[in-house]
Amino acid sequence: MQYRTIRAAASAEFVEKRSRFIGYISPVTTQQDAIAFIDSIKSKHWDATHNVPAYIIREGNICRFSDDGEPQGTAGMPALNVLQKEELTDCVLVITRYFGGILLGGGGLVRAYSHAAKIAVDAGGIVTRAECSIVKIRCDYTFYGRLASLIPEQGGIVEDTAFEDVVTVKMRIPQELEPAFEARLVDLSNGTCRGEITDTVFADID
């Protein structure tokens, strides 16, 4: 299982006809975290004309947005549409606007909020996360060199290595790749090495 989300919290801004738009974005995993982020931006920009939120939470398939006083359909939905177009989840976006005295019109607002959302996404970066198996492998020193090459070849990442009477390697690998890795490991080691799955986590794979 894989999904796309924002790599890190970030912000970006631009000015359109003297109105200042600031897009804030952050990865989150719960609706409570999303609401807390929105509240923090509203507190920071308490004097703004509008603070327009949008968020998508993977668990429960939750999507929420608000126009926060802008004409209906001109702010929150365009911001949410950017997140959906990028196939993002587990992220929250707030676009702060300081009105500059010049009306943008409905189409102008849609374009401005869409652009603010897009530059915030670009600033935060997009990462793909996959459900990964944490695998522990014990091998002798003669096989370690082949194991060290095999892990990246099969799409795995070494997290820790302990050199004692034998070598113990802790690695992670996307779940869909683990069976093929295990088969290759057993084949190359003539059955002397096998992986033990100790945990399952979501981790960045790009």
What name fits each language-model region?
Residues 89-92, 120-132, 145, 160-161:
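Short, structured loop/turn "capping" segments at alpha-beta junctions
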Residues 138-156:
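Short amphipathic alpha-helix segments
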Residues 126-141, 169-171:
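Short glycine-/aliphatic-rich beta-strand segments at the starts of folded cytosolic domains
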Residues 75-123:
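Active-site beta-strand/loop microenvironment that shapes enzyme catalytic pockets
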Residues 1-74, 196-205:
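C-terminal regulatory domains involved in ligand/effector binding and gene-expression control
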Residues 158-162, 189-206:
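Conserved short beta-strand edge segments in small beta-sheet-based binding/regulatory domains
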Residues 147-153, 180-189:
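Short amphipathic alpha-helices in soluble, non-transmembrane regions
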Residues 171-180:
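Terminal, non-globular segments
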